């Protein structure tokens, strides 16, 4: 498995911060995964709910009884490092950190982002983010839409990577 396959071609994924609360990123990501027809297993992670959008939820990735290829992290930035530690202990090699609150608000956030980068490198993980739009794979074999752009992308065989959320969202919309 290549380093990009960990992110773009997962057979299972956890949404850390999955939610039943409407109009939250954790809720929107869950809905998009289902609506776009993700072909793998989805494990909602939320310590307060036993079920998210009709799926069994787990308090932590460590409680999931199956292997997980990738984690989409949509929790408060101050909890992200702990979530990354748990992902490492679970053997998850690909993470997408949608959470904001890293270097964009200032020095404290920049330090938090530096710690995240160090952990990702130490653990040998592939990471997209933090503070990103998410990831999409339009290949019908995977049908992965773990982002919060306005519209669902057309299925097909074109790849696209964008550092800019505005540009990426514009292309997807």
What does each model-found stretch correspond to?
Residues 1-173:
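Catalytic-core regions of core metabolic enzymes
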């Amino acid at each position: 498995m290549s380093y990009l396959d960990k992110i773009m071609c997962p057979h299972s994924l956890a949404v850390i911060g999955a939610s039943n609360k409407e109009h939250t990123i954790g809720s929107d990501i869950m809905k998009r995964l289902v609506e776009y027809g993700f072909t793998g297993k989805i494990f909602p992670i939320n310590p307060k709910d036993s079920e998210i959008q009709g799926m069994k939820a787990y308090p932590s990735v460590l409680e999931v009884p199956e292997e997980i290829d990738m984690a989409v992290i949509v929790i408060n930035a101050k909890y992200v490092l702990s979530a990354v530690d748990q992902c490492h202990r679970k053997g998850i090699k690909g993470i997408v950190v949608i959470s904001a609150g890293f270097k964009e608000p200032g020095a404290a956030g920049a330090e938090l982002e530096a710690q995240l980068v160090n952990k990702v490198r130490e653990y040998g993980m592939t990471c997209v983010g933090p503070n990103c739009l998410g990831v999409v794979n339009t290949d019908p074999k995977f049908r992965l839409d773990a982002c919060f752009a306005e519209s669902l992308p057309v299925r097909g065989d074109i790849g696209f990577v964008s550092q800019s959320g505005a540009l990426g969202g514009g292309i997807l919309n």
